[in-house]
Amino acid sequence: MEHYKLLITVGIFFLNTSLVFSQENVNTNERDFRITKGKYYSSLTFSLDSRIAKNEDQLIRQVVDQNRYDYRIIGNGGYAIKDNMTLGLLAGYGRAREEITFVDENGENVTSKRLQQGLSLAPNMRNYIPIGKGQLQVLVQTELNVTFGESLQRTFRMDDIEKVEGDFVDLKLGISPGMVLFFDKHWAFETTVGIAGLSMRIEEEITNDDRDNRQRVVESGVDFRINLLQLNLGVAYYF
């Protein structure tokens, strides 16, 4: 599937680039890569997930054609309150788009187009676990993520078009593990995966511009599986 290929390709690029930089730094023994009390950091990461499918059986429906992408840009900054521990705040923007045609239970072709975007804020705490001299470190980020967003979905049937507009708030409390690889005393590559933990979504929906009959939907869940498909890659500066 396309999104697996994309993530594998990006992951291989990240690892190969990291190895090149690490091989060029021959004097790493003289450098101090530790995250010590009083240090600051700032980072910029990016994630992309895309999927293209044709004539695929997705268990609950037969998909004729599907085209989806989802990306996020995240800026993060923080301060080390003690060795190997930081407190910070991240801000991000995400956008998702999907166009899918599938066969419903009546054998009718249905086309759905959905667009969603949102802004996120998340206070967070990071714990670093140095490996060896600390040029490579395991990162565990705990965060409370709040996303404010909007969505628009249009569903096209043979004799009907339905439009659903939504405003939502997403709350997520959980952990996001990752790795940090320093290629300089101050600069590092960072990669993290999707949050595992508690989530809640509150959304108000308006169907076909009928604002007098708006619906309020509340969803909550617990998921402690690490989402390896949501891979964030970026660069950080420590000073």
Regions found by a protein language model. Name each.
Residues M1-N27, V235, F239:
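Bacterial Sec-dependent N-terminal signal peptides
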Residues G178-F239:
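Predominantly the C-terminal beta-signal and adjacent terminal strand-loop region
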Residues L44-S50, L89-R95, V140-F148, M179, ...:
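Transmembrane beta-barrel strands of outer-membrane/channel proteins
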Residues G78-M158, G166-D170, W187, I226-F239:
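Gram-negative (and chloroplast) outer-membrane scaffold detector with strong preference
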Residues S22-L87, D223, L228-F239:
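Short glycine/proline- and aromatic-enriched beta-strand/turn motifs that initiate or cap beta-hairpins
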Residues K54-R61, E99-E108, E150-I161, I202-D210:
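Outer-membrane beta-barrel translocator domains and adjoining extracellular loop/strand segments
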